[in-house]
């Protein structure tokens, strides 16, 4: 699982460490994913690490 308690953040780093969300969308890194989790009110979850 991914700890998103420190999010949302106003800006994400550009590093590419893809994670796959439960929406079958590939997020570029944990920061981008966690921001989306917060926006979804916690309905978005981690599918797996790596591309979808």
Curated annotation (Swiss-Prot):
InterPro entries listed in its UniProt record: Bifunctional_prot_inhibitor, Kazal_dom, Kazal_dom_sf, Prot_inh_Kazal-m
Disulfide bonds: 4-34, 12-31, 20-52
Primary location group: secreted
Marked site (Reactive bond 3) residue numbers: 14-15
Subcellular location(s) of the protein: Secreted
Keywords: Disulfide bond, Glycoprotein, Protease inhibitor, Repeat, Secreted, Serine protease inhibitor
Domain Kazal-like: 2-52
Positions bearing carbohydrate: 41
Recorded superkingdom: Eukaryota
Coiled coil: none
Record's signal peptide: none
CC per GO annotation: extracellular region
Stored Gene3D superfamilies: 3.30.60.30
A Pfam family that the UniProt record links to this protein: Kazal_1
Domains: entry comment: Avian ovomucoid consists of three homologous, tandem Kazal family inhibitory domains.
Protein name, entry field: Ovomucoid
Natural source organism: Coturnix delegorguei (Harlequin quail)
